[in-house]
A protein has these predicted regions:
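A conserved beta-turn-beta hairpin within the catalytic core of GNAT-like acetyltransferases
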Residues: 105-115, 124, 174-179
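A short beta-loop-alpha structural element at the N-terminal edge
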Residues: 46-61
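Conserved beta-strand in the GNAT
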Residues: 90, 96-105, 111-118
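Conserved catalytic-core motifs of GNAT/GCN5-like acyltransferases
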Residues: 149-151, 161, 166-181
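Helix-loop element at the rim of GNAT/NAT acetyltransferase active sites that forms part
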Residues: 64-76
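Conserved GNAT acetyl-CoA-binding A-motif
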Residues: 140-153
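Conserved acetyl-CoA-binding loop-helix of GNAT-fold acetyltransferases
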Residues: 125-138
Length: 186
């Protein structure tokens, strides 16, 4: 018998095919609170993604954020004090880190904020970002969240709109990159 491990398997429709999704909660490992395996397909590609939760900033998230935000997009201030209090998700494909997201609670707005959402370039357009945010939403829903906020790059706002986020207010610049605040009511 596996100690402190629950497995639930169910089916969900992805890209017009039935795929299996396995959710596993592993309380045995302190760094890995839980993880899920998602299966999706894009054209001829089949990707299996495993999502792990962390209470401290993992090196795999640092790697992804440096690749996407620092090297690719030229941000200089990628890491901040929120990294000290946030919860992190990292998505793995065949054991390699490919996507990440951080989650923190903003008491001033009484809202959970998703941020530093990044998917490595070769994996964009494969629904891995959607799967990662679905898991992030499940995490905050379990904490009785009523709303989620995101400071989105304007070029990615359409992606977030497909997930139910709504633009709020005016665009603003973060490190010379246009952003828009978005919210989703749960």
């Amino acid at each position: 018998m596996k100690n402190h491990t629950d497995v639930l398997i169910f089916t969900q429709r992805f890209v017009s095919e039935q795929k299996q999704i396995a959710m596993m909660a592993d309380e045995k490992s302190p760094a890995r609170i839980s993880h899920r395996r998602f299966a999706t397909s894009c054209s001829e590609m089949r990707i299996i993604m495993q999502i792990k939760h962390f209470d401290t900033l993992p090196e795999d998230a640092v790697f992804i954020r440096k690749e996407v935000f620092v090297k690719e997009q030229g941000f200089k201030n990628e890491f901040d004090e929120k990294d000290n209090e946030a919860h992190f998700l990292v998505g793995y494909e065949n054991g390699s880190p490919v996507a990440t997201c951080r989650i923190f609670y903003d008491p001033a707005k009484s809202i959970y904020i998703f941020g530093r959402i990044a998917v490595l370039k070769p994996y964009r357009g494969t629904r891995l970002g959607s799967l990662l945010l679905t898991e992030a939403q499940s995490y905050v829903t379990a904490k009785n969240a009523a709303k989620i906020g995101i400071s989105a790059q304007v070029r990615a706002a359409g992606f977030y709109e497909t997930l139910g986020f709504v633009r709020q207010g005016e665009e603003y610049l973060e490190e010379n990159c246009p952003h828009i605040y978005m919210e989703k009511t749960l």
